[in-house]
């Protein structure tokens, strides 16, 4: 499985570089959307070196990857460090054994500590832990215990994600529990509120939607300097207008359009065998989309946006403000003549605020099945 898949990804990269007008200059690489440390170090080396062969590397670059605490070895960490990777994130989720059994992810704290310590010993400059609230059987004590345990390792960043319960999707691993075992909306809200307060108490700063960082981390500095950006992989300290996603179901972003690869492995292979870039669907942004995108990014990255400049104005702004009027009454945001500022209380509703700007979503809302609760 490993070698054929790496071969396929490198073939896809070749197809892209064959049609690009110039040799690509890589500023960022993120290995994720899954756990690349399931691959042997030798295969990861072949993948990254194969990518490097057809590109130049920017002097100031940032390479990161996602690691599973149970199968990330020191060999993985050393190899990727030698290839230029300096940031790693580990999927911790929750330290409660009952919760871990329900989500089929048993991983003791000792494994998280081992890979965190090893990354720092090797020289990684940023280690992140991904925590999740709203998991089946999860209690407030579980959330606080998980935060406190991770805090003993002092990761540079902590992502505090909401669990998305999508029971109508089959085969997604969410089957070690019943629907009633998942915390209700009100309980889930409490888990988030108390968890956020604990993170702030122990010295982490809120830097964006679901993300917290120590003041010494580059992500925090980017937030303070209004240089934070967000893409499909999450927050980043640099902005690039072209992001090429490689692999099954990967998403690419050229700023003016999105494209997604085949989600089925056989279909992905078949397209590559025909020397076709395996994109199965996409969307070209129109001028209105581009303006809306900038407002949503401003809100997600800085909790404020303005339409004082003509290039940030659009016809439906009054409709958006009407949608947000109730939130202003509730103290979640302030609306001035040509600007919105999200309050501290409103930060946890940032997804809802951004949804008011998503005109395409508003237009199809009556027929849309909301994928999961925003919190």
Which ranges hold each PLM region?
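C-terminal scaffold of the Radical SAM
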Residues: 2-19, 25-314, 374
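Flexible mid-to-C-terminal extensions adjoining Fe-S/redox cofactors in radical SAM and related proteins
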Residues: 294, 302, 324-326, 330
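Short, loop-centered acidic/histidine patches that primarily coordinate divalent metals
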Residues: 300-302, 336-338, 345
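A short, conserved structural fragment
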Residues: 328-338
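Short amphipathic alpha-helical interaction segments
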Residues: 314-328
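Short, amphipathic alpha-helical interaction segments positioned at domain boundaries
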Residues: 347-375
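Intrinsically disordered or highly flexible coil/loop and linker segments, enriched in small
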Residues: 278, 304-305, 333, 363-366
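Short, cationic-aromatic polyanion-contact patches
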Residues: 99, 224, 339-357
